[in-house]
């Protein structure tokens, strides 16, 4: 997630500046510094980082440029079919990156079950939340690059990421609604129905 990585770098630079400014004070109180360092180390060690990815609310896991804390989650897979496309929402995570940036990560998988060339664009999925916020497109910078065109029996998977302005937007999140346009062929003929999925989350 590029934006999260930039945020992590910014936090690192800020920390280095603060350390440089406090250098003289730290040298004159080495015993106090040792105590503080020990405290910081213990605090860091006491924060469990989920190495296998998040599984429940409250989990902290690694992302590019730092960590994210889960505010709401769905581990239940939802699979639907529209025309020749089989579409699965594998996981939904609402989290806050580096205690600053709220986002929703929708992990998906799409499969063309036909030999036709099919155009299907989950990368343009519209999202609405139970908290009353609507985002018309995922963040192109943060989301994985997904196929728009499926040449025969191929599949694709990845994350589509929605970035929010305020943590309140995902606090106590009960569900999301995901809308995706119908698949179509090279002649622009619709091959199925639009998808309109509701995913319930634990929070």
From Swiss-Prot:
The keyword Electron transport does not apply. Residues 1-21 form the signal peptide. It is a lipid-anchor. Coiled coil: none annotated. It is found in: Cell membrane. A lipid is attached at residue 22 (N-palmitoyl cysteine). Residues 27-57 are annotated as: Disordered. This is SPbeta prophage-derived uncharacterized lipoprotein YonS. The gene is yonS.
